[in-house]
Regions:
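A generic local structural motif
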Residues: 62-63, 94-95, 106-107
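Solvent-exposed loop/turn segments at secondary-structure junctions
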Residues: 14-19, 60-63, 81-85, 114-115, ...
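A short, Trp-centered hydrophobic/proline-enriched beta-strand micro-motif
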Residues: 75-79
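Envelope-exposed proteins and targeting segments
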Residues: 73, 103-105, 117
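Cysteine-nucleophile protease catalytic domains, especially the papain-like/related folds used
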Residues: 1-65, 70-73, 151
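Short, glycine/acidic-rich beta->alpha junctions
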Residues: 57, 101-104
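Noncatalytic regulatory segments and standalone regulatory/sensor domains
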Residues: 85, 89-101, 110-157
Length: 157
């Protein structure tokens, strides 16, 4: 993959007023309670391909996720903020409303340790808002059920 810093990547990412299937809805820098602030995996993968071999990995099993990580391929997974239970709210999406996950959060998985059954997580939000480590290990028993809520993911090969 091409070298690009996070700020440049986020600044150039496609944006959309409200639809995460068309681009990042809202701002990647500021929370906005009125919008579903995210970008869906297919659009993120499409954008990411300009930097390297990136693919929408949504719908894949936990075992497939682990295989990618054990092959050295990082994977963006959509889980929940602070690993909390999922909760939902209704958002205006143009001319209609949709009930969507409210506490959505995306993190980068950098590895998997099959001996400890833990994932190596890169989470810049963890530093900014919690004063915690950028990289940390998360138990599979916490991560996997949250991944399986939607099975949204993007792999970088």
């Amino acid at each position: 993959a091409q070298e690009v810093d996070l700020r440049s990547f986020l600044d150039a990412m496609p944006k959309h007023e409200y639809d995460p299937a068309q681009g990042f809805a809202g701002s990647p820098y500021q929370p906005d309670q009125s919008k579903r602030t995210t970008i869906y995996p297919a659009k993120l993968a499409e954008y990411g391909r300009q930097y390297g071999d990136v693919a929408d990995f949504s719908g894949r099993s936990v075992e497939e996720l682990q295989r990618e990580l054990l092959s050295g391929n990082p994977v963006v997974v959509y889980v929940t903020l602070w690993w909390a239970e999922p909760y939902y709210r209704t958002y205006r999406m143009g001319d209609h409303e949709e009930t969507l996950l409210r506490n959505n959060h995306a993190v980068l998985l950098c590895g998997y340790d099959s001996q400890t059954d833990q994932y190596n997580v890169a989470d810049p939000y963890n530093v900014k808002c919690q004063g915690q480590d950028y990289f940390y290990w998360q138990d599979a028993s916490v991560l996997e059920p949250l991944y399986l809520v939607r099975q949204h993911a993007v792999v970088v090969r």
